[in-house]
Amino acid sequence: MKYPTLLDRFLVYVKENTRSDENSTTTPSTQNQVEFAQNILLPEMERIGLQNVHYLPNGFAVGTLPANDPSLTRKIGFIAHMDTADFNAEGVNPQIIENYDGNPIALGTSGYELHPKDFPQLANYHGQILITTDGTTLLGSDDKSGIAEIMTAIEFLIQNPDIKHCEIRVGFGPDEEIGVGADKFDVKDFDVDFAYTMDGGPLGELQYETFSAAGAKIDFLGRNVHPGSAKDQMINAFQMAIDFHNALPETDRPEKTEGYEGFFHLMNMEGSVDTASTTYIIRDFEEEDFQARKQLMLDIAEKMNANFDTPRVIVNLHDQYYNMKKIIEKDMTPINIAKDVMENLGIKPLIEPVRGGTDGSKISFMGIPTPNIFAGGENMHGRFEFVSLETMEKAVDVILGIVAYK
């Protein structure tokens, strides 16, 4: 179905810089997110007719659409995140490509282009309306597509009261991209039977498996002496960091894994001969494999420390989120409903694991099962990001089908 306000709404959202900051200690991590919620989303939620619209200390803008059919007793939530990833988000200047013809798309005057040889999925979008960047910023489809789709669906229901639906709660939150947005999610305030994050990618994605995730910080304590007299005395902290990294499986890296394969990802290395540190993210799907990856890091450190008279490799691990499959599989109702709705709309459900995490990962373990549905974005987190308006329209169709499902 066509929704006249969807594109304009999306364009308003993406032009707002809501980049999150992993080094911040505030919630939300950036003031821009607060202003986006308070100055744009909350007034719009009230304008279109949502009830009990409020802004929580955890950074979530929340509202309710009461049921208009007493036989539809479920309470269903829809969640999307306001922040964008760690890439330039200032001065987003979207391009609208009408009736895409399959050729390369110049991204403004940046010198970059979306080329089918680099991004073969462009072949799926012949004849569609694409929204791209101008090559200097990301687009922000992740996850302002989701916000626009939820808002458009709610507006459509309010303007068409003959469409019967259950009670709906919507929540637009901060800091998903830095992994902390749902840490303070208020389950009691949201009060639904289950929810969906509208935070997936291409048409049909329906996801209830995520990585289990941990972070690791490894400190290396060296001993610096003059290199001219260093034999049997110098202990180079940088070399220890290199040795540690090389002891990890070479094939278990993001660029060499797919599907259900986990990985270690070296994110940062800094220091000197005297001291050095590295940070990693650890990802896997099965609990046994996830625990084994963390143990391997501890084992490597123990083996390296055996060469010294005092521990010089110190590993600090912290879990970040867990595979929500463990929760969702207890009651597959939200998956079955979404799957039926997609199939009734002629959309083939793509039920596959998320090689990442969503706010739903944490919210599911807090007590609200929250799988993930496509929002349309492709090549997210960078200058080559784009989204199809037709896919966004179908995401709105899916939301409308879910809330009317009997």
From Swiss-Prot:
Any one of the GO BP annotations: peptide catabolic process
Similarity comment text for this entry: Belongs to the peptidase M20B family.
Protein's job: Cleaves the N-terminal amino acid of tripeptides.
Active site per database record: 83, 176 (proton acceptor)
GO cellular component terms attached to this protein's record: cytosol
Recorded GO MF terms: metallopeptidase activity; tripeptide aminopeptidase activity; zinc ion binding
Gene: pepT
Protein name: Peptidase T
EC number per UniProt: 3.4.11.4
Binding sites annotated in the UniProt record for Zn(2+) 1: 81, 142, 199
Binding-site residues for Zn(2+) 2, renumbered to this chain: 142, 177, 381
Alphabetized Gene3D superfamilies for the sequence: 3.30.70.360, Zn peptidases
Catalysis: reaction(s): Release of the N-terminal residue from a tripeptide
Subcellular locations according to the entry: Cytoplasm
Pfam families named among the record's database cross-references: M20_dimer, Peptidase_M20
SUPFAM superfamilies: Bacterial exopeptidase dimerisation domain, Zn-dependent exopeptidases
Keyword set, alphabetical order: Aminopeptidase, Cytoplasm, Hydrolase, Metal-binding, Metalloprotease, Protease, Zinc
Organism name: Streptococcus suis (strain 05ZYH33)
